[in-house]
Amino acid sequence: MKALTTRQQEVYDLVRDHLAQTGMPPTRAEIAQRLGFRSPNAAEEHLKALARKGVIEIVSGASRGIRLLMEEEDGLPLIGRVAAGEPLLAQQHIEGHYKVDPSMFKPSADFLLRVNGMSMRDIGILDGDLLAVHKTQDVRNGQVVVARIDDEVTVKRLKKQGNIVQLLPENSEFQPIVVDLREQSFTIEGLAVGVIRNGDWI
């Protein structure tokens, strides 16, 4: 399958989501309206491009004649090693998909992150575990978060006071990471909501 352009991906996502929500694909006019195209003909051109790339099939003679061919992966994306400067959920970081029900976690998990190291050992997060993560930036002091400092991704307990963030380990052999928000790039990628070890939720 050939890679999709950003616009083609938007059209594909719209068709997929419309199917999931209503049970039928959108019309060309609906696609044009939702994505700001000037006419349904522009939507038709994008659909033809998607058909050429093998991700949809256009069924002639029907205003909603669109069939998805590209199978969506089941389960939660598993994030492995993250390259510097790239989004955590970039396609190249996804090692695979893990068949687990996101709703078994509260709040529900959006992705899994492979744990690297033993800095959170004392609360049962071990090297090689799969950490279930709810994607959000709405977190509170004391919660275990997935954070990005400059280009490093880490799992720690959050303590924020003014412009200073401390990321606290749960292992006395490790030192806290101190971040000055005035000098360093800092992003919360999500909230830890559970751990999977050897295929079992614990």
Swiss-Prot record:
Catalytic activity annotation: Hydrolysis of Ala-|-Gly bond in repressor LexA
UniProt cross-references to InterPro entries, sorted A to Z: LexA, LexA-like, LexA/Signal_pep-like_sf, LexA_DNA-bd_dom, LexA_repressor, Peptidase_S24_LexA, Peptidase_S24_S26A/B/C, WH-like_DNA-bd_sf
Site, Cleavage: residue positions: A84, G85
Keyword Thylakoid: no
Lineage: superkingdom: Bacteria
DNA-binding region positions on the chain: 28-48
Key words, A-Z: Autocatalytic cleavage, DNA damage, DNA repair, DNA replication, DNA-binding, Hydrolase, Repressor, SOS response, Transcription, Transcription regulation
One example of a Gene Ontology biological process annotation: proteolysis
Signal sequence segment: none
Molecular function as annotated in GO: DNA binding; serine-type endopeptidase activity
Keyword DNA-binding: yes
Enzyme nomenclature, EC number: 3.4.21.88
Active site: S119 (for autocatalytic cleavage activity), K156 (for autocatalytic cleavage activity)
Subunit description: Homodimer.
UniProt record similarity statement: Belongs to the peptidase S24 family.
Described function: Represses a number of genes involved in the response to DNA damage (SOS response), including recA and lexA. Binds to the 16 bp palindromic sequence 5'-CTGTATATATATACAG-3'. In the presence of single-stranded DNA, RecA interacts with LexA causing an autocatalytic cleavage which disrupts the DNA-binding part of LexA, leading to derepression of the SOS regulon and eventually DNA repair.
NCBIfam families: lexA
Protein name per the record: LexA repressor
